[in-house]
Regions:
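RNA substrate-binding interface of SAM-dependent RNA methyltransferases
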Residues: 3-100
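Short glycine-/acidic-enriched loop or helix-start segments at secondary-structure transitions
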Residues: 32-33, 58-59, 105-107, 129-132, ...
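Residues at secondary-structure transition points
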Residues: 30, 78, 123, 127, ...
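Structured adenosyl-cofactor binding patch, chiefly the S-adenosyl-L-methionine
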Residues: 132-171
Length: 171
């Protein structure tokens, strides 16, 4: 009979994913905590919280991160364009997860090289800023079939990372 494993019974394998998550103006403590947890789950090398000072003492961050904020390498309160320029210079492929007039679906996107990836996500209400979108050549969106054109930023990041990791064979 199948039984759910406890945390202590779960075998963990740490992998180097060569992937960085860049958050452009994400401010909600619940989303920040959720993104820490997500980054730990996917083995993300680093997460940048641009334009946001992360309040690690926040009970909401602690609760939603389930202590992963203590495990994930991160930098906060930094300018998004500075991060984009630094990562591009280091050879990362920047990808914007945003529905735009030039975006492709995650399903149709093809990875054509083995460069490390920097996935950019945006603010809960306004998305990725226009000045950042103008500097990133590849825009990707999640195909959605309901009446809403957006989803929660943490959920979108999870879908985006999973789709990219399937294409890069990280799983």
């Amino acid at each position: 009979m199948a039984a759910q494993l406890t945390h202590h019974d779960t075998p963990f394998t740490r992998a180097k994913t060569n992937t960085i998550l860049v958050c452009d103006g994400v401010t909600s403590p619940a989303n920040i905590g959720g993104l820490f947890r997500l980054c730990d789950s996917f083995g993300i090398d680093k997460v940048y919280f641009c334009g946001t000072k992360v309040a690690l003492a926040s009970p909401r961050i602690k609760r939603t991160s389930r202590s992963t904020h203590l495990l994930v390498n991160y930098k906060d309160n930094i300018e998004t364009l500075d991060v984009l320029n630094q990562l591009t210079e280091k050879g990362y492929t920047p990808l914007a997860l945003e529905l735009t007039n030039s975006s492709s679906t995650l399903r149709d996107f093809k990875i054509t090289n083995k460069k490390p990836i920097a996935l950019f996500i945006g603010n809960e209400k306004t998305g990725i800023s226009t000045r950042v979108l103008e500097q990133i050549h590849t825009h990707l969106h999640i195909p959605m079939y309901g009446n809403n054109s957006s989803m929660n930023v943490t959920q979108a990041a999870a879908v985006g990372l999973y789709a990219l990791f399937e294409k890069t064979n990280y799983f």
